[in-house]
């Protein structure tokens, strides 16, 4: 159907699997399709996959609707499952030498044996005056990653890229940036993705990576006797509380945020409350903004669930 330039972003969440597929064109990305399928209750416990067969069945359905020829399929590990540390090295080291150095330092960086970790690293910032360079080392349990990859394989899919959700969120905003208000000072914003059960906050593209992925400590609506209006009020209160704490953590790094860019499950009235309580402007945005469209897309208030899948689909690495 399409040339082998189709890139697929697959967001595996505890409530649903969401997929976006795009084609890279000279003038940018073209959206070719998007879809979601709910995940049966009990498939996940928090971020832990406890019923792989149920997830495999959902992924098999997803596989059937995707184009047959793909350039890449990108998934992401949840931010809460990821550990991150920094390491200073000599700037003159080659990439291979940096890898050896990171491997040697793994026992002191993370509280798990090195053989239990899957890790990656990247340079951040410029070389210091004394010839040093900061490496950001990201790691996750190898068992967790292998669980996801095995389920994908069982559904006939293969992940070419395993990313992390904070970077997917940043990338989604990066491709939608042209649709944001011109007067917005992007470097002063924090990115927020609010799902039914989690709050993901990260710094904007182009800045040093900061992120927090927090579960929302509120009752879920399924089988709950609490009135929906009260549940919504409790949820908004919890989101406001956690965002306040995360902004304090961010400011403690020496950076400031004067606004929030939110993709998530928020009504317009909730956005106003959030803005008032935190004393900052809150701006919504659509992950599909900035894409040329070969298919129709949902309105902004319904587009937010596809934010991470969209950010994964527009991955531009090699």
What are the functions of these language-model segments?
Residues 1-318:
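Hydrophobic/aromatic-enriched cytosolic interaction surfaces used to assemble or bind macromolecules
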């Amino acid at each position: 159907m399409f040339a082998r330039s189709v890139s697929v972003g697959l967001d595996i969440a505890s409530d649903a699997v969401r997929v976006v597929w795009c084609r890279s064109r000279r003038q940018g990305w073209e959206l070719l399709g998007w879809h979601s399928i709910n995940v049966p209750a009990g498939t996940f416990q928090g971020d832990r996959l406890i019923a792989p067969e149920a997830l495999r069945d959902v992924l098999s359905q997803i596989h059937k609707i995707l184009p047959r020829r793909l350039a890449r399929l990108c998934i992401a590990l949840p931010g809460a499952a990821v550990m991150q540390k920094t390491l200073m090295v000599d700037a003159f080291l080659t990439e291979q030498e940096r890898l050896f150095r990171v491997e040697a330092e793994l026992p002191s960086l993370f509280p798990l044996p090195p053989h239990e970790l899957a890790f990656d690293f990247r340079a951040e910032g410029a070389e210091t005056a004394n010839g040093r360079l900061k490496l950001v080392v990201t790691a996750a349990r190898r068992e967790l990653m292998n669980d996801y990859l095995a389920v994908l394989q069982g559904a006939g899919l293969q992940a070419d890229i395993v990313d992390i959700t904070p970077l997917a969120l940043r990338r989604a905003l990066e491709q939608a940036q042209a649709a944001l208000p011109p007067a917005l000072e992007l470097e002063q914003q924090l990115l927020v993705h609010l799902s039914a059960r989690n709050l993901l906050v990260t710094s904007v593209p182009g800045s040093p990576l900061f992120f927090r992925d927090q579960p929302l400590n509120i009752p879920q609506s399924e089988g709950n006797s609490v009135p929906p209006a009260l549940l919504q009020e409790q949820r908004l209160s919890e989101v406001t509380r956690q965002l306040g704490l995360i902004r304090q953590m961010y400011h403690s790094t020496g950076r400031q945020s004067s606004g929030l860019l939110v993709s998530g499950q928020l009504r317009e009235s909730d956005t106003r409350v959030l803005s008032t309580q935190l004393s900052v402007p809150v701006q919504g945005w659509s992950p599909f903004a900035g894409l040329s469209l070969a298919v129709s897309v949902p309105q902004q208030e319904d587009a937010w669930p596809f934010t991470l899948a969209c950010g994964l689909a527009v991955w531009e690495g090699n």
